[in-house]
Amino acid sequence: MTVHIHPAVDQGVKQGSGSFAGGTLVCKCQDRPVKVGIKGDVAHNHACGCTKCWKPDGATFSVVAVVPRDNVTVLENGDKLHVVDASATIQRHACKVCGTHMYGRIENKSHPFYGLDFIHPELFQEGGSAAPEFAAFVSSVIESGVDPSEMPGIRARLKELGLEPYDCLSPGLMDAIATSVAKSQQKAA
């Protein structure tokens, strides 16, 4: 039996073009869809097992990446957007009608990822954005209802797809967080 991760990777991870210049994210509404413009390619694209990220029906993981916040512009029907949870670190701006998360923004200027917005590359009208590179917060899928006995098969499938599974972020991103924290502590001393 094949373990389903996410429709964007279940048939294999499709590599990006290497020259993706950006595009338009579109929500799932047929009438007046929300459209968000993204300049440039995505970074740190990954499968995410956390329970906060939006994912399509039937997906075990979301697929999420980051872009500089200055590269994100609401193009159409922004009146349909609302923040899902105002108390969350990542302010997820979702369509009120279909529920699709269009972008997530960190407003806390001291957060290591401040200045980066989180997006779901599968929502691009255009193809060619950078491919998912790893899987983060893998154990968290248990919180969304996955039986713990399925975890070895899920981790094996992620590895088969070339998405190294982590129960936090990738080592490079964890290093970036630790570096940011260390710098802030040096300033405080």
From Swiss-Prot:
Q: What does it catalyze? A: S-(hydroxymethyl)glutathione = glutathione + formaldehyde
Q: Does the keyword Phosphoprotein apply?
A: no
UniProt: Zn(2+) 1 binding residues: 27, 29, 95, 98
Under Gene Ontology molecular function, one entry of this record is: zinc ion binding
Keyword line: Lyase, Metal-binding, Zinc
* Gene3D superfamilies tied to this protein: glutathione-dependent formaldehyde- activating enzyme (gfa)
Q: What is its EC number?
A: 4.4.1.22
Pathway this chain belongs to: One-carbon metabolism; formaldehyde degradation; formate from formaldehyde (glutathione route): step 1/3
Q: Which residues form a coiled coil?
A: none
Q: Which domain of life is it from?
A: Bacteria
Q: Is-annotated flag, keyword GTP-binding?
A: no
- Where does the chain bind Zn(2+) 2? 48, 50, 53
Group of enzyme by EC = lyase
**Cofactor names:** Zn(2+)
Pfam families on file: GFA
> CENP-V/GFA domain location, by residue?
20-167
Q: Which GO terms describe its biological process?
A: formaldehyde catabolic process
The free-text note explaining how the cofactor binds reads:
Binds 2 Zn(2+) ions per subunit.
Instruction: Check the record and name the PANTHER family matching this protein.
Output: CENP-V_GFA DOMAIN-CONTAINING PROTEIN-RELATED, GFA DOMAIN-CONTAINING PROTEIN
Function according to Swiss-Prot or TrEMBL: Catalyzes the condensation of formaldehyde and glutathione to S-hydroxymethylglutathione.
Q: Which HAMAP family match?
A: Formald_GSH
As for family, the record states: Belongs to the Gfa family.
Name the UniProt record assigns to this protein:
Glutathione-dependent formaldehyde-activating enzyme
Organism of this sequence: Rhodopseudomonas palustris (strain BisB18)
The organism that produces this protein has a lineage beginning with: Bacteria, Pseudomonadati, Pseudomonadota, Alphaproteobacteria, Hyphomicrobiales
Chain's gene name: gfa
